[in-house]
């Protein structure tokens, strides 16, 4: 299967090179590699290899580097990383704009997908009425015992993502809503740890509150985001508010080093055209989190199965 996928991609690369693009010579892209960061959630890593594969199809060189999901914007600004392809508004918007204000990083456009990053529960928790009143946040006041675990000190547990993602955003919210006497926020070490906990809870039929996001592979299984007080500008503690508000529906952007349009004009033009939908991003994540493929193999399969999506971006 992998041999077939590699052959498909090689054929695609040859077709692109012969079919009027003339590869990197016509684009006059630099021989220096495009540095693409990888973070710690599946869609981002698969998409890194998908975009890298598209760049390689026009003859460009690509390198992948692990990078902190907040500090990456400084790395792009300083030229250590070339692009960021999943800039989530709620989590990374502030870091992105702070870097832009300093100079050296540019906005390369939005994906078609809109985003939500929020606490929620698997749909069966609502469907089976394990906590009557969900997904309204007020229901949590009377359901702490449903979400208690061995490590939650008798309180309901809220499983957040790694603390590097949001800092104390969720603990601050729980405190502002007066729920801190009934719930404790625990930080997962990785996205994989969240998925493992969700799978375990589903198998046991027990209640669980976790951080999650859309687009993601969980969209297909059913996941209900808790309806917290509406987000408004300035509602978070960092912006002068009390921190009780939920998360906004946001954009999903792309960012690039300011030299990228000059050093790799063809690749940069392609990058500005790239726009993934919610379903496409969910598919990328599902190949890893459900089908248990490696990130690299998932990207090869996605590229082979979706030539009609990405090839037009190269023309």
Question: Residue ranges of each PLM-predicted region?
Answer:
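Pocket-flanking alpha-helical
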Residues: 48, 67-103, 193, 197, ...
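Ligand-binding pocket segment of bilobal, Venus flytrap-like solute-binding proteins
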Residues: 81-85, 159-237
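Short, well-ordered beta-strand elements
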Residues: 29-43, 60-65, 155-159, 271
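A conserved helix-loop-strand patch within extracytoplasmic ligand-binding domains
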Residues: 104-159
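A bilobed periplasmic-binding-protein/Venus flytrap-type ligand-binding module shared by bacterial periplasmic
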Residues: 117-130, 250-263, 286-287
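Short, polar/charged alpha-helical segment
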Residues: 42-61, 174
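C-terminal functional modules
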Residues: 268-315
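Immediate post-signal peptide segment of exported/extracytoplasmic ligand-binding proteins
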Residues: 24-35, 55-56, 147-155, 309-315
